[in-house]
C-alpha cells in the first residue's frame, strides 16, 4: 500500500487501501495481469484505468526507508506497461486513463492512451473551464487524441426536468463546439449525474429526443467540430482592434459570460467557423446548474475579414426542424483595412454554427 506523511496506510472511505503502483511494486505487476485477464477471460475490449485524484504524493515502504513517490511520474509508465500487456493479450485493445479533476493530464496525455479522458470536478465549475480543459488536453496530446469529458449533470437528480434539459443542451453545445466529446448518456434515457454510475437518473422522453438531435447534429458536422487543423482564434481575432471578426451587437463574449452570446471562433485554410451558444437569460455560468430556457436572440450581424472572394456562408442549428445547412446572404465591404463580408444570423435559440467556405 501507499502511506501518508504520518506513515499510516492510505485508505479510501475506510474500506479500500490505496495500493502502491510504483515501478517494481508487486501490486503493479498484479494489476496489469488483472487487466489482461479482463480482456482474455471476461471478454472486455479495453480497459478504463481509474484513480481517486488524491493522493498525488505518497510514501512507499518497499525499501528500508520510506521514500516519497510522485504519482504523476509513475502513471505514464504504468499506462505504457499496461498497453504492452494488453497488446500481448488481444488485437487492438482500447486503453483510457481517468484524469480526475484534470490531473495529471499534462503527463498522461503523452502516454499510450487512446484518448484523453478527464473527469470534471470543482474548481472547474464554469463554461469557460470546459473550453480550457479541452484546449489544454489537445495541446498536451499534440492535438492527436480525442478529448472526452466526464462532466456529470447533477441537475437531472436535483432540479426540475426543464432546468436540467437546458443545462444538458448548453453543455453539449459547449463541449462539441470546442472539439470535445461528452460522457453523459446511457441506455434507455439514462443520464449520469454523479461519479457512481449505478446511481443514474432518467431523462424525460422529450429531453431524450432533443439530445438525440444534438448528437445527430454533431455527427453530421464532424468536419466542422473535429477537424484537427481548425485553430481556435477566439482570444486573438475579435474585440479591441482585432478586425478579423466583428459583431454588430454588444452582448457577446468569448469567455462564456452569463447573459451573453458565447462565441467560439475556429479556422483553417478552407473554413472560418463561428460557434454561437446562447447564454442570454442565464443568471450564472456554472455548467452543473440548471438553466432557464435562453432568451431567443434575433438579427445577429457579423463582419468577417477575408482574403478574397468566398464560396459561401452557411448556417446550421439542431434547434430547427432540420439540421440542414442554410445559405446566408452576404455582401462584401472594402475599406482601408481590407476586404470583408457582412451577414446576419436571423435567430439564435441555443446553438448555431456559421461557417464560411473560402
Language-model features, listed with the residues they occupy:
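Aromatic- and acidic-residue-enriched segments that line the glycan-binding/catalytic groove
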Residues: 1-12, 59-66, 113-115
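Substrate-binding cleft/loops of secretory-pathway carbohydrate-active enzymes
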Residues: 48, 55-57, 91-137, 157-176
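Active-site-adjacent "subsite" loops/lids of carbohydrate-active enzymes
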Residues: 1-42
Amino acid at each position: 500500500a501507499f502511506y501518508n506523511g504520518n506513515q499510516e496506510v492510505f485508505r479510501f472511505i475506510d474500506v479500500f487501501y490505496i495500493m502502491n503502483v510504483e515501478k517494481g511494486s508487486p501490486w503493479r505487476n498484479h494489476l496489469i495481469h488483472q487487466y489482461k485477464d479482463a480482456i482474455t477471460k471476461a471478454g472486455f475490449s479495453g480497459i478504463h484505468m481509474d484513480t481517486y485524484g488524491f493522493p498525488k504524493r505518497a510514501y512507499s515502504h518497499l525499501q528500508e526507508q520510506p521514500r516519497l513517490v510522485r504519482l504523476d511520474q509513475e502513471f505514464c509508465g504504468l499506462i505504457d506497461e499496461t498497453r504492452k500487456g494488453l497488446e500481448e493479450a488481444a488485437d487492438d485493445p482500447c486503453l483510457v486513463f481517468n484524469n480526475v479533476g484534470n490531473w495529471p493530464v499534462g503527463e498522461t496525455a503523452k502516454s499510450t492512451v487512446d484518448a484523453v479522458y478527464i473527469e470534471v470536478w470543482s474548481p472547474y465549475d464554469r463554461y469557460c473551464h470546459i473550453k480550457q480543459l479541452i484546449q489544454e488536453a489537445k495541446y498536451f496530446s499534440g492535438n492527436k487524441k480525442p478529448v472526452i469529458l466526464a462532466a456529470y449533470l447533477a441537475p437531472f437528480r436535483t432540479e426540475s426536468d426543464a432546468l436540467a434539459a437546458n443545462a444538458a443542451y448548453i453543455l453539449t453545445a459547449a463541449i462539441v463546439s470546442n472539439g470535445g466529446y461528452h460522457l453523459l448518456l446511457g441506455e434507455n434515457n439514462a443520464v449520469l449525474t454523479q461519479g457512481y454510475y449505478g446511481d443514474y437518473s432518467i431523462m424525460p422522453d422529450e429531453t431524450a429526443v432533443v439530445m438525440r438531435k444534438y448528437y445527430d447534429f454533431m455527427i453530421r458536422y464532424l468536419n466542422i467540430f473535429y477537424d484537427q487543423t481548425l485553430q481556435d482564434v477566439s482570444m486573438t481575432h475579435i474585440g479591441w482592434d482585432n478586425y478579423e471578426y466583428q459583431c454588430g451587437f454588444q452582448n457577446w463574449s468569448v469567455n462564456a459570460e452569463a447573459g451573453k452570446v458565447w462565441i467560439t471562433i475556429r479556422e483553417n485554410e478552407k473554413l472560418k467557423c463561428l460557434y454561437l451558444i446562447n447564454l442570454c437569460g442565464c443568471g450564472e455560468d456554472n455548467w452543473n446548474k440548471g438553466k432557464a430556457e435562453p432568451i431567443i436572440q434575433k438579427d445577429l450581424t457579423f463582419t468577417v475579414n477575408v482574403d478574397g472572394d468566398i464560396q459561401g456562408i452557411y448556417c446550421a442549428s439542431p434547434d430547427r426542424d432540420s439540421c440542414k445547412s442554410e445559405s446566408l446572404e452576404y455582401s462584401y465591404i472594402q475599406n482601408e483595412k481590407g476586404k470583408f463580408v457582412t451577414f446576419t444570423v436571423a435567430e439564435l435559440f441555443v446553438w448555431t454554427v456559421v461557417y464560411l467556405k473560402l
